[in-house]
Amino acid sequence: MPAITASMVAELRAKTDAPMMECKKALTEAEGDLNKAEELLRVKLGSKASKAASRVTAEGIVVAHISGTTGALMELNCETDFVSKNDDFLAFGKTLAELVATKAPVDVAALSALEIAGVTVEATRTALIGKIGENIAIRRFKRFSGDSKLVSYLHGTRIGVVVEYTGDDVAAKDVAMHVAAMKPVALTSADVPADLIEKERNVAAGKAAEDAKAAEAAGKAPQSAEIVTKRVEGSVQKFLKEVSLFNQTFVKNDKQTVEQMLKAASTTIKGFTMYIVGEGIEKKTDDFAAEVAAQVAAAKGQ
């Protein structure tokens, strides 16, 4: 078998983008045959991707791409915070956001079929999984286009906001920053989803019921049904004010609401979208004690 030289390893790495040690192992296994080593690596990287596919991806990045009145916001997930800072992972996310903005895929499947430098997004993702050793998932994206101006704000790589607006650019940027900080769920109270309102109403009613039980236990008269109804409705209205953008106190000036700030700046917000990394994904937690106990039990044949 010919000696495995540094130049052979470098050439294989350039072709496959695999780690140096993986390239050396493949060349050794292929007895110096570069083509065979490349084939072995392709299989190995694909195998790594298959094994990683079932693992939870609750970390990652949010990326925005804005070009005039066209833009995109997307979330790319991985398994650990460490990988979310990897240069290749970050570059992949940036490229995907640009693809969404320029090619307008309708869903993740359509995005995965697009090409990056002659290679499909899916093949690129699979190769990156093999290189990094973690599952990588394109979770979601939204494309923006139309007559409205666009502005984005990124809080690191974990929170991303895109605001659609007409009017003052500085005011719109401030709103994007405000959204990231205060996390409204809708523009106005009327836009808040009915299920969130119902949930808040149930919570308020539950608190009132607990107070009634406590009053009875203390030998006091509980609040009347009329007072309870007003109390519940008051809680709901307070909630609506807290979660609707226009009603929120402006984060940079607590003397005015966002709506008042926008009016003074002659600016209209048409909509906003916010992504938070891992939002709604149940993260896996490792129970070390339980794992050790299971291993001991297995060793005892239990």
From Swiss-Prot:
Pfam families per the UniProt record, alphabetical: EF_TS
Subcellular location, record wording: Cytoplasm
Keyword Secreted: no
Domain of life from the UniProt record: Bacteria
Record-level GO cellular component terms: cytoplasm
Involved in Mg(2+) ion dislocation from EF-Tu: region residues: 80-83
One GO MF term attached to the UniProt entry: translation elongation factor activity
Keywords: Cytoplasm, Elongation factor, Protein biosynthesis
NCBIfam families reported for this sequence: tsf
Free-text function comment from the UniProt entry: Associates with the EF-Tu.GDP complex and induces the exchange of GDP to GTP. It remains bound to the aminoacyl-tRNA.EF-Tu.GTP complex up to the GTP hydrolysis stage on the ribosome.
Family statement: Belongs to the EF-Ts family.
Protein name: Elongation factor Ts
Source organism of this protein record: Methylibium petroleiphilum (strain ATCC BAA-1232 / LMG 22953 / PM1)
Source taxonomy: Bacteria, Pseudomonadati, Pseudomonadota, Betaproteobacteria, Burkholderiales
